[in-house]
């Protein structure tokens, strides 16, 4: 059959209905695209609004070629009159197109009655003709045509949709409309560029459809439609193979690695950007362009998997290096260590944990301020004042400031004269009211008390062993190592159920160590949380211990790469597991030890013989060892090598990030983790900030509902290294020693000299992460997104100069956008900043940022907000006078009131109490088109605004004045 795509200059559905009802008007039909095939059937088609199964045209009527001389009109570029079409319509074939719309009613009986049957039959024949059916169902047919088909009446629609060049227009229309393939118009237009270098003349907008029809029917590209269809299908198949290969490469790496959800998004973005960037895709188009010297079956076959191989070379290979142990530590991790020569002031806790009596200080936050003010007054002439806050207490407990004090000893020399000894005192002596000896740095603990109260304690001496460990601990420990499980079972700790109001007692139930950035860190204390899968029905004893052993193997391997002097067979890694919830199902037997207690044999509902059988192997199915549901909480502690400590919170945060990434590099560990938990960062880095606290091992949580019940104790799990297998009791004592369980405690097994520290870790750098707060994928994505941007400083200077009437300074050239360019070799990551990114801010940049926000960005935002915000909000915004830079691209905005800077009330919602606690910011960034984007956002502390979550209100583009 022959298919004719036509158009009209008026309402096409009405013209078609008039022809079907044999009441043609004087309108004409313009055949634009014809697909010939020897047949007596000519289908006149229109483009559909929807294309199920890639069917993009459907017939609206069918003509008989014996009654319609189509070639006569086409050869002379003459439009088809409606009356000629009407005479050539095949009524039977056309009727089938609209059969579903015709309303053909019958009697309820389903057959003709005897009386009047002949008349009924005659009437049925007269009304069942196409003419009559269209007449009686005109509204339904018009509705169908309007809802199903596109019926443009101007040539400009075809030019804007399919292309303005002659070749692009005809080849795209013929392939997209007549070839049922999965392709879009834009993709087909791109195929035409690869098919021919000469797309023909540029077609201007035609005034009438007749000239447009003549141009299309007389084009030389009509002869190339068949050849182009063959090429486009081959190219389409090649594109599909390329994308499937790229998808397979991306998914293969994603499935092998344990990427968190946000990291996975960054990875997918980077992968597709690398493989399908503009430069790579243009090169791919050159390799798959039409070659007239090749046969049709060899078109688009050169260099298979071109995009996938570029992805391998420019991203996957780098990812494989970064996600392998040797490549990661060998190419990306650098540890900056410094030697110390005595005397130096780096000291850990001077903390006696085996004293007969407790020496310390405890206070609430309110009383702490009073005590520190009193201490400042007492030591005013000796020491600089401390801030009367918790930060002041931390500074006091870490201070190395001493003053000499002369006192006479009671012993006399051989000459009978008294001998004067020089002793030293510090502010800690005054705080503890003890001047008998110099008191060194002390730990500061936060203790949770009943009724949601907190007490802060500074402890110099206590008896940890007597208060927390059983008296017969050494008697119950085996002399020979059997297994980690047996050794863990041999240690039974005393259980507590309820909290007490005495601080001295509660200190041994809910103690939290506070991180003190003024002290060196001797032990890496890791807070590990594994988000468990919802379908997990508990973990067996074997699974929990195997997981801990795998964690030790992976972490000690990373420790060995960071500190080569570490012996992996003897260096300890201490594990503590948070006890399971008390109401978890199936908590019994040995799970009671780790389920927080609460088990009573008298309350066991099982028969006596069944309960007795629990201890006999596999006689009955044991309940799970761990019945945690939401997360599995672990405390993992790794001491630094002897005579080595780390300095600074950022060092600990980066170290936690490195260990977190290391967990993704061990295939065996990844399999274990994926089976029980969701991917994501395991180590909490928020605990390594000055003044933040972390619950110590052997301590409980306090129930929020009651404020009295203790639960989720951190119980020990002993994973004995090979070097301690001959003396397991010594390892147990080390794991229960408090000096090994705190950030700043000095392990007692090292030599007892005061200045034992000989080396400190200053920085640990991941060369792939220029931003210390971001990971590898985030840093790479930021560099990819910032490529092509102008530096913000020169851009702001240009805006300010033009705003003040001066000539704008010359702007630096734009950096080209490349796909592989953002990350070719691994050496690219050694640069801290990408070319073209913002430089380090100086005073001029800060002043320019504040001036731009005050003089240009804020007035532009005010003009926009007048029509979109409430009057009281607008009044607040117009009162803003203080603009302070808080980052390279961020400005804090405050109102000026009576000479003071004030925050705002809520900008998004009306609140009952209009508290002025909302922080407002202006984010200012440039783009590659030399525009500046100003974004207004705020943080509101109310729950209705998601408790301090970032709320973006509006973004505004500010162009250079010369572009207005």
Curated annotation (Swiss-Prot):
Which of UniProt's keywords are assigned here? Answer: DNA replication, Host nucleus, Metal-binding, Transferase, Zinc, Zinc-finger
**Can you state the subunit structure given in the record?**
Associates with the helicase and the primase-associated factor to form the helicase-primase factor.
Record EC number: 2.7.7.-
Annotated family: Belongs to the herpesviridae DNA primase family.
Q: Which HAMAP family match?
A: HSV_PRIM
Query: Where is this protein localized, as stated in its record?
Result: Host nucleus
Q: What class of enzyme is it?
A: transferase
InterPro entries referenced in this protein's UniProt entry, alphabetically: HSV_PRIM
| Signal peptide, first to last residue | none
Q: What is its main location?
A: host cell
Coiled-coil stretches, from where to where?
A: none
Q: What is this protein called?
A: DNA primase
Give the positions of the site Essential for primase activity. 527, 529
> Which BP terms in the Gene Ontology apply to this protein?
bidirectional double-stranded viral DNA replication; DNA replication
Q: For the region Disordered, give the residue spans.
A: 807-844
Q: Which gene encodes it?
A: UL70
Q: Name one GO molecular function term.
A: zinc ion binding
GO cellular component assignments? host cell nucleus
């Amino acid at each position: 059959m022959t298919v004719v795509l036509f158009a009209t200059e008026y309402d096409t559905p009405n013209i078609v209905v008039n022809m079907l009802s044999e009441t043609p008007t004087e309108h004409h039909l313009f055949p634009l695209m014809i697909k010939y095939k020897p047949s007596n059937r000519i289908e006149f088609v229109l483009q559909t609004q929807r294309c199920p199964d890639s069917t993009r045209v459907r017939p609206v009527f069918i003509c008989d070629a014996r009654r319609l001389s189509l070639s006569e009109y086409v050869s002379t570029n003459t439009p088809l009159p409606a009356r000629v079409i009407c005479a050539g319509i095949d009524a039977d074939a056309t009727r089938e197109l609209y059969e579903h719309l015709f309303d053909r009613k019958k009697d309820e009986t389903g057959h003709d009655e005897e009386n009047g049957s002949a008349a009924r039959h005659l009437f049925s024949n007269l009304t069942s003709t196409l003419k009559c059916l269209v007449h009686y169902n005109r509204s339904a047919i018009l509705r169908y045509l309007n809802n199903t088909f596109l019926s443009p009446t101007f040539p400009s629609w075809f030019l804007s949709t399919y292309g303005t060049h002659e070749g692009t227009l005809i080849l795209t229309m013929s392939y997209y409309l007549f070839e049922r393939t999965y392709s879009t118009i834009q993709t087909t237009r791109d195929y035409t560029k690869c098919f021919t270098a000469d797309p023909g003349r540029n077609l201007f907008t035609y005034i009438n459809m007749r000239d447009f029809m003549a141009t299309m029917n007389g084009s030389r590209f009509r002869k190339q439609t068949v050849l182009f269809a063959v090429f486009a299908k081959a190219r389409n198949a090649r594109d599909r193979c390329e994308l499937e290969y790229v998808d397979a490469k991306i998914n293969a790496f994603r499935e092998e690695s344990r990427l968190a959800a946000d990291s996975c998004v960054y990875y997918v973005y980077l992968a597709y950007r690398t493989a399908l960037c503009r430069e790579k895709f243009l090169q791919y188009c050159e390799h798959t362009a039409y070659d007239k010297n090749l046969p049709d079956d060899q078109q688009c076959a050169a260099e298979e998997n071109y995009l996938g191989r570029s992805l391998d070379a420019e991203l996957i290979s780098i990812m494989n290096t970064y996600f392998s142990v040797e490549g990661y530590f060998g190419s990306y991790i650098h540890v900056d260590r410094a030697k110390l020569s005595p005397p130096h002031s780096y000291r850990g806790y001077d903390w006696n944990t085996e004293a007969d009596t407790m020496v310390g200080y405890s206070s609430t936050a309110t009383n702490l301020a009073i005590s520190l003010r009193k201490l400042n007054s007492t030591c005013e002439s000796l020491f600089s004042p401390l801030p009367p806050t918790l930060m002041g207490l931390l500074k006091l407990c870490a201070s190395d400031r001493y003053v000499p004090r002369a006192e006479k000893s009671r012993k006399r020399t051989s000459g009978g004269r008294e001998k004067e000894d020089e002793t030293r005192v510090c502010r800690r002596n005054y705080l503890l009211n003890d001047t008998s000896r110099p008191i060194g740095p002390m730990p500061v603990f936060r203790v949770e008390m009943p009724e949601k109260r907190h007490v802060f304690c500074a402890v110099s001496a206590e008896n940890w062993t007597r208060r927390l460990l059983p008296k017969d601990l050494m008697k119950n420990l085996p002399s020979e190592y059997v297994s980690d499980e047996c050794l863990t079972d041999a240690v039974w700790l005393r259980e507590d159920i309820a909290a007490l109001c005495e601080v001295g007692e509660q200190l041994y139930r809910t103690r939290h160590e506070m991180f003190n950035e003024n002290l060196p860190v001797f032990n890496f204390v890791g807070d590990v949380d594994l988000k468990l899968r919802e379908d997990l029905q508990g973990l067996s004893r074997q699974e929990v211990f195997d997981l801990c052993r795998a964690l030790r193997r992976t972490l000690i391997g990373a420790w060995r790469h960071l500190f080569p002097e570490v012996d992996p067979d003897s260096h300890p890694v201490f594990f503590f597991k948070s006890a399971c919830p008390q109401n978890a199902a199936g908590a019994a037997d040995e799970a009671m030890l780790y389920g927080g207690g609460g088990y009573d044999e008298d309350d066991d509902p099982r028969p006596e013989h069944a309960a007795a059988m629990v201890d006999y192997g596999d006689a009955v199915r044991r309940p799970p060892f761990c019945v945690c549901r939401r997360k599995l909480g672990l405390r993992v502690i790794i001491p630094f090598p002897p005579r080595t400590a780390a300095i600074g919170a950022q060092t600990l945060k980066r170290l936690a990030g490195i260990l977190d990434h290391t967990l993704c590099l061990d295939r065996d560990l990844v399999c274990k983790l994926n089976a029980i938990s969701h991917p994501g960062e395991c180590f909490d880095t928020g605990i390594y900030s000055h003044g933040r606290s972390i619950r110590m091992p052997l301590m409980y949580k306090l129930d929020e509902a009651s404020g009295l019940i203790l639960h989720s104790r951190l119980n020990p799990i002993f994973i004995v290294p090979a070097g301690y297998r001959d003396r397991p009791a010594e390892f147990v004592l080390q794991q229960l020693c408090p000096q090994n369980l705190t950030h700043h405690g000095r392990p007692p097994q090292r030599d007892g000299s005061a200045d034992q520290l000989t080396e400190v870790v200053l920085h640990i750098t991941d060369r792939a992460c220029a931003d210390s707060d971001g990971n590898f994928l985030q840093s790479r994505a930021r560099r990819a997104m910032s490529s092509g941007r102008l530096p913000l400083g020169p851009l702001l200077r240009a805006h300010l100069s033009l705003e003040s009437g001066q000539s704008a300074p010359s702007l630096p050239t734009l950096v080209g956008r490349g796909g592989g360019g953002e990350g070719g070799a691994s050496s690219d990551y050694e640069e801290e900043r990408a070319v073209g990114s913002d430089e380090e801010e100086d005073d001029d940049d800060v002043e320019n940022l504040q001036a731009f926000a005050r003089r240009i960005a804020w007035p532009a935002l005010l003009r926009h907000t007048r029509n979109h915000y409430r009057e009281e909000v607008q009044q607040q915004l117009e009162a803003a006078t203080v603009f302070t830079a808080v980052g390279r691209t961020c400005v804090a905005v405050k109102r000026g009131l009576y000479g003071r800077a004030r925050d705002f009330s809520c900008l998004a919602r009306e609140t009952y109490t209009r508290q002025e606690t909302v922080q407002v910011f202006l984010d200012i960034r440039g783009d590659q088109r030399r525009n500046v984007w100003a974004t207004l956002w705020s943080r509101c502390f109310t729950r209705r605004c998601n408790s301090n979550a970032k709320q973006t209100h509006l973004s505004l583009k500010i162009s250079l004045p010369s572009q207005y």
